[in-house]
Amino acid sequence: MHGNDRISRREAIKLAGMGLLAAAVSGACAPKKVTAPPVRPYRNFPMVNVSSDRIVRQAVGLRPFRPGGFVVRYDRIGNKDIVHNYGHGGGGLTLSWGTSHLAAEKALSLGHRSCAVLGCGAVGLATARLMQFQGYDVTIYAKDLPPNTTSNVAAGQWSPFTVFDENSITPQFYNEFIRASRLSFGYYRKLIGPHYGVRVVDNFYFGYSVADLPDAIHELPEIYGRLTTLIPGQYPFNEPTCVTLKTMLIDSPTYLNAMMNDFRNDGGKIFVRNFGEIGELLTLREPLIMNCTGLGSYFLFGDRELEPVKGQLIVLLPQPEVDYITLVHGAGIYMMPRSDGIMLGGSRDYGNWSLAPDPEVTERIFTRQSEFWSGQPSV
């Protein structure tokens, strides 16, 4: 004891007589209780206003899923050389540049100088641009153009996930998948900026541990970088765990519009046309056909391994201040902010060909999103 804590001899005698000396000494010498500093928020979290009067529309897209993964393959039909590039599941926007690079490699060895590209979504446009970069005269033929493609429905997170069934792929395919992911990331990184609508944002995986994250995140450390585990108090949501990382967010309407303009400005031609059978392809003037029809390959080329995976979104009014992505493990929902609105998902309905919103799915997404943003724990 020292300073003001010193007890005088007279006070000691007095306290001893009262039986209080031991208590006084022990109290003076006891360590002071240390209060842990408050947990600081990881960042500012502008909150999404989930309200029925803010719903702009609902969106439905059919992901072209193949358990064995996407197809990048050469084919010869009649008098045409055909290079296939389809079947990306939920990763079409993400992988578009990478698989198109692989497809272009196959096409360049054939010696043509002009080609037809079937499809005008993310994969078709990336393929068309890469062929233009190589000096090809390129014409796109497509049933639907932006903003009416499946790629326009994509919420936009750069994420090579839900592309295949891990029990149905070969080691050779997986190596091709990893290469395509790396290639695609490299192309997108050069497009970061408002013109193409590509930006880097924080992703928050609530209800996840690092081990729970998709395998591709662990396979591509040079892309995903640091994985940070957060604790309650660092975020304003009623979730026990959270892992955060950074990825690109692709504002698909902005991106697809810019890509289509680039293609046309470099001399590319686009025709709206629906091919009902392969025989119609043989009438095209181009000797080389790049098939980027997605789910259309089920009908046009008879690929019965393809199946639709229906995805449904609720689109809220835009909130420009929301600049991060949330994915909630227990509830199976996600939020991604785009310029045209806040995208609330998610759903995966395998084998469902309907493009009509399912009211039960809408109610589930809305209810779980409302609970999450109001601070209730996820299911």
Q: Each predicted region: which residue ranges?
A:
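Predominantly flavin-linked oxidoreductase catalytic cores and closely associated redox partners
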Residues: P146, M248-P318
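Flavin (FAD/FMN) cofactor-binding and adjacent substrate-gating region
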Residues: L15-G19, A59-N79, S151-V153, L183-D262
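N-terminal Sec signal peptide cleavage junction
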Residues: A28-C29
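Beta1/beta-strand and adjacent pyrophosphate-binding region of the FAD-binding site
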Residues: R113-G121
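N-terminal secretory signal peptides and thylakoid transit peptides that target proteins
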Residues: H2-L20
